[in-house]
Amino acid sequence: MSVFRFLLFLSLLVGSNAFVKPQYNVTGQIDSALQRFFGITLPSLKIPDLLNPDKKRNPPSVGQLKKTSFPLCNVNLPPIFFTISLFRIKLPNLIPTALPVIKLPTIKIPNILPTLPTIKVPTIKIPDIIPITLPTIKIPEVVPTNLPTVEIPHFIPKTLPTVKIPNIIPTNFPTIETPDIIPKILPTIKIPEIIPLTLPTVKIPDIIPITLPTIKIPEIVPTKLPTVEVPDTIPKTLPTTKIPDIVPITSPTVKIPQIIPTIKIPDIIPKNLSTLGPIKLPTIKLPTLPHILPTKSPKPTPSHKGNMVCDICEKVIGVLTTRLLEIIQKFRVEADKFLTKLCTSLTSNPKTLTVGTMCVMFKGNIMDTIFKGFDGLKKNLEPVSFCKHVPFCK
């Protein structure tokens, strides 16, 4: 409240500045005192001239203030004397010099990811599904060990009478000597040389030096087979897997009764045998041999069906002819291609045109003469006609 009173007092002093004589200049002293002791500057108030509104708003001088008069109201104020004694008044510190120490509250931020609690898993003992030691199972004796002895009458006698059968078939057969129709040592068969080993050399007139191409005949049966590397699909070392012992290693011991009961079969055959009839043995007919044996080799059947020698011969000749004809056909195609290329190159050049025409004629003649012999060879190598010359296959 004292602060508010002091401020009200200051406002009254400022308001009375207009009515106080200017010689005292109280407001200036107050302003300087406030500024000196408290550091406060009061605002300067400008009072408008309400009586002379048309006058310029210039600050009046000291002489002008002396001459101002108030015609409308004459106020005679007694002279006011101020005795100002300034004392050092200890005012409370409105603005504190040292800021108070503000203790901020410590805020504990909760853990967003809390630590998981340690859960103690209880140890569960799993019972043995299959016990290691199986119990011994005692099988009840279905068949009793001590069976009663039942005596059955003897229908069949213990000792049968011996019956002697006469020897109808003689034991010692007469030895019959058969002549050697098929000789032990077969004769050597010479196959005629239809294909000559050395072919005749055909001399071609050297009209143009020709280098014939070297034709490699393919091997019918390859000597060296290609090595094929098979990738190791199956690993060399297989992983070892341990199979769990589902079935126990030691099987249970089962006691089986060792005593087997003796069962007596009744004698179905009667004791007294009746007189049996005559026993008929089968008659065996031996093959009758001719009285006059042939001196020469036997004549084979006209048809060679079922003859093993003929079958082998025909198969071998058939395979050889097919292989040989394939080789001849390949050689013919390659030779024809080479000669046609040579003749076309000669005929295309005008300088060697005459030689080219001769080449075409020569090509036709030589191909016909060479391969006519091969065609005749094909006819001679028919399996049936060729195998007729082989003995034992006529």
Curated annotation (Swiss-Prot):
InterPro entries: Saposin-like, SaposinB_dom. Residues 1-18 form the signal peptide. The lineage of its organism: Eukaryota, Metazoa, Ecdysozoa, Nematoda, Chromadorea. Glycans are attached at N25, N272. SMART domains: SapB. Residues 306-394 form the Saposin B-type domain. It comes from Caenorhabditis elegans. Disulfide bonds join C310-C393, C313-C387, C343-C359. This is Saposin-like protein 11. Keywords: Disulfide bond, Glycoprotein, Signal. The keyword Cell inner membrane does not apply. The keyword Glycoprotein applies.
